[in-house]
């Protein structure tokens, strides 16, 4: 196990959980709330998945690979949805989600497991 890769993944997951929570809250306060309902739900789900991933890594869960894969997929879906909206918080969240997905995938790349 490459501890540096896991450390970066945890950092990205924490950042992503915070950004997704902030984005969901900001979306709730927008005028076009109906157009943002899917974004809000995906933000909440992504934040929850990122928190689960951090706990799994910290606890050395035997399913880390599967959990990281699901987290990466969740981040991709959230990033895609956020990118559809013009709001700065959505665009920022999309970028953070993409970075998190990349770190989740990198942590389980064959070279990362030593």
List where the protein language model places each region:
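Amphipathic alpha-helical hairpins
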Residues: 1-114
